[in-house]
Amino acid sequence: MRGLTDGRTPRGTRRTTQAASTAVAVFVALGVSLAGCGTGGTGARDEGPAHADAVGGAGSASPAPAAKASPSKAPDRVDAVRLVKADPKVSPEVKRELKPCVADEYPIDVSYGKVTDGSADDVVVNVLTCGDAVGVGSYVYREEDGAYQNVFKAEEPPVYAEIDRGDLVVTKQVYDKGDPVSSPSGENVITYRWASDRFTEEYRTHNDYSKAAGNAPTPAPEPDS
């Protein structure tokens, strides 16, 4: 998962917003009526396709065209880098990590959606490291009186926050003593819900990573005979 180390198999018990779109092809068979010979001596006759007035009766009104749905308004984009750097609640360590990796590309993920009861979309920001894209800070900003206010922060890396059906879901990887940085022992998945002007923890799930999967040594190549 983005923002977390990849030394273990990702969790299988929870996956947010997983969906697969399946395209369905519909084929319409066009029937062709074969003309038969009339018994009244009129000869062969071609029968064309049925018309709408033959099915629905003469003078049937054509159905009104379906109304087009108006496109949803895209959320206003914010300068997340400036927002984080100007935020006094963000630690100096995270601000030091927030620097361009290549040219003017910053290691930052930004999501827009509803996780509070504000009138505008909330902004979820994840600050990552440049080298391995590990999350070092997760924040939620809520618009209040025309300005964005920090209403949530988590700065215990590796950490990553997501919006899941109106809830805030934060994943934190955990380490046992002796675990290398690339191989955490598990993760805590914490779901927060907005109530009474703050986030409260609803529930949490702990997942242990396998110690065997993915750790088999790579066999040495056999010498050419």
Swiss-Prot record:
Residues 40-77, 205-225 are annotated as: Disordered. Residues 1-36 form the signal peptide. A lipid is attached at residue 37 (S-diacylglycerol cysteine). It comes from Streptomyces coelicolor (strain ATCC BAA-471 / A3(2) / M145). It is found in: Cell membrane. A lipid is attached at residue 37 (N-palmitoyl cysteine). Its main location: membrane. One of its GO terms (cellular component) is plasma membrane. It is a lipid-anchor. This is Lipoprotein CseA. The keyword Repressor does not apply. It comes from the Bacteria. Keywords: Cell membrane, Lipoprotein, Membrane, Palmitate, Signal. Residues 60-73 have a biased composition (Low complexity). May be involved in the stabilization of the cell envelope or may interact with the sensor protein CseC to modulate its activity, in response to cell envelope stress.
